[in-house]
């Protein structure tokens, strides 16, 4: 019975730490950049896009495809950085064990 109570206490502590981690991840922001800075995407470590900046020189109706490609690239860059930030924070929670890719909070 004592083992069960100990496990329940550990589960409650882990749940509390996870809530704290969610809050921390919401405060962490990363920036994805493409086109040498022509497109910037700011994203939280919870993968929420916060802002998109597009250089006005890209707003040419004849080159929509270029803008689309740069936007996809900037989003992918931000996503990679956010995933790395989340993994770093999770290592502190899990005592150094890393989570498999894609297994976020």
UniProtKB/Swiss-Prot annotation:
GO molecular function: DNA binding
Disulfide bonds: none
One GO CC term on file: bacterial nucleoid
Chain ranges passing through the membrane: none
Compartment(s): Cytoplasm, Nucleoid
Superkingdom per UniProt: Bacteria
Keywords for the protein's UniProt record, in alphabetical order: Cytoplasm, DNA-binding
Signal peptide as annotated in the record: none
Stated role: Binds to DNA and alters its conformation. May be involved in regulation of gene expression, nucleoid organization and DNA protection.
Family to which the UniProt record says this protein belongs: Belongs to the YbaB/EbfC family.
Subunit structure: Homodimer.
PANTHER family registered for this protein in UniProt: NUCLEOID-ASSOCIATED PROTEIN YBAB (PTHR33449:SF1)
Name this protein carries in UniProt: Nucleoid-associated protein RPE_4812
Species per Swiss-Prot/TrEMBL record: Rhodopseudomonas palustris (strain BisA53)
Lineage: Bacteria, Pseudomonadati, Pseudomonadota, Alphaproteobacteria, Hyphomicrobiales
